[in-house]
Amino acid sequence: MKILESLAALVVAATLFPASGDACTRAVYRGPDGMTVTGRTMDWKEELHTNLYVFPRGIERRGGNGDNVVRWTSRYGSIGAAGYDIGIADGMNEKGLVANLLFLPESSYERPGDNRPVLGLSIWTQYVLDNFATVDEAVEELRKERFRIDAPDLPGGVRSRLHLAVSDASGDSAIFEYIDGRLRIYHSPAYQVLTNSPAFDKQLAVNAYWKEIGGLVMLPGTNRSSDRFARASFYIDAVEQTADPSVAVATVFSVMRSVSVPFGISTPDKPY
């Protein structure tokens, strides 16, 4: 049942891909009896021409071109949504692990003289889905920093600057960000929400201010990343808590609508 619930959450992600506005929000709903649903918006600035792909176990993969790349064989089957057909932005594997990439302009992956094996940013999500069943497993392995991220520009010349959110069927969650070439990991079931700029530690600080005020008193209402973070953080816990999969998915849809950017709207000086 939990796998079906997570699959429904992936559908939430896929159906929200074609919006516009350079903004994304991810939220994890944790209801009674282990009910877990992960949803996200994809309010990108242009059509991503998203396709869904189903991958079986046992696929041999490479982290990029050349010889000095990460190589692995997928342990788990998965389904993923690919933007521009160049990489999986959102996906879920057969164990209920969900991974979501969101834009973070503060990201920087480079270290001077770094000769570790390469993992392309476009396959980072798939690497996680292929290899791990739980957030704990992903955190334990990724914190070893065995590879370096290669991040070529996206179509249109946009620099690839992304952070990764991972959640599992138990409701656990982790955020992975590269700042100044170093991996930062934030691991807790309490980290249910992720948006864009600023980096996650600063988002938590801003959200702490709004928690003191209280969501029933006032919530910030713009499409800026920190405002969406505060709204999603309040609503994902304030909404009805249910073990009914259909109601839970509908509830996540309602939260996602509250942070979706209207079509064609963006903030020129703060698009993320």
Q: Which residues are covered by each model-predicted region?
A:
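Short helix/loop capping segments that flank catalytic or ligand/cofactor-binding pockets
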Residues: E47-L48, S108-E110, A174-E177, R184-H187
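Bacterial N-terminal signal peptides
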Residues: L7-P18
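C-terminus-biased signal that marks the final domain/tail of proteins
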Residues: G21-V37, N51, R61-R62, D150-P152, ...
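A contiguous strand-loop segment
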Residues: A23-R116, I149
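Proteins synthesized as precursors that undergo proteolytic processing into mature forms
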Residues: N115-A151, P245-V255
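Short acidic-glycine loop/turn motifs at beta-strand connectors
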Residues: R30-D33, N93-K95, D168-G171, E177-R182
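Positively charged n-region of N-terminal signal peptides that target proteins for export
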Residues: M1-S6
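Aromatic- and glycine-enriched pocket-lining scaffold segments that form the walls
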Residues: V135, V139-F176
